[in-house]
Amino acid sequence: SFESYNEITLPTDYREFLLASNGGRPTENTFALVGHREDASDVSFFYGLDHPMESLELQWMFDLNEGYFADPVFDNFFQIGHDGFNDKICLDLSDERFGAVIFIDMVPMWKDHTEKDIYVIADSFTAFLEMLYEAEDED
C-alpha cells in the first residue's frame, strides 16, 4: 500500500476519503484563512493514487516534496492538494498535531519558507471538509 511503501501512517478520515473519492476537484472548495493577508483560499485539487496526470498523483508529489524545505519544521507535512496559487495544502503527520490540515503560503516560490508561512486550517481532515463552502461569483 501507499502507506507501507512510504513508511507513513495517514489519518483514518483522510484514508477513507481517498478510498471513496481518490481525490479530485471539490465543488465546495473555499476555506477561510485566519491570520493571512487573504481572507480565504481554495482547494484547486486533492491529489489521488494512480492519477493519470503525474502532477496530481500522491506518490509523485510525495517524492517531489521529500527534502524540498530546508527548515525541519516542514518534515512531518504530507501534501494532499494545492490552491489556485499553488500554495500547499498538507496534513500534519507529527505526534503533536496528527491529522491537522495545514496551509503553506508558497508566495514567493523562490524564498526560503519558514514557520511564518504555515497556517493551521483545521484540526482534522473531516473538520476541513466540513468548513469548505462554495464561493460566490464576483462580477
Question: Where are each of the predicted segments found?
Answer:
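A surface-exposed partner-binding patch
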Residues: 1-87, 135-139
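N-terminal non-cleavable signal-anchor helices
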Residues: 35, 44, 102, 121-122
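Short, surface-exposed beta-strand/loop micro-motifs that present aromatic residues
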Residues: 88-93
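Intrinsically disordered, low-complexity regulatory segments enriched in Ser/Thr/Pro
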Residues: 97-110
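Compact, glycine/acidic-enriched structural inserts
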Residues: 107-133
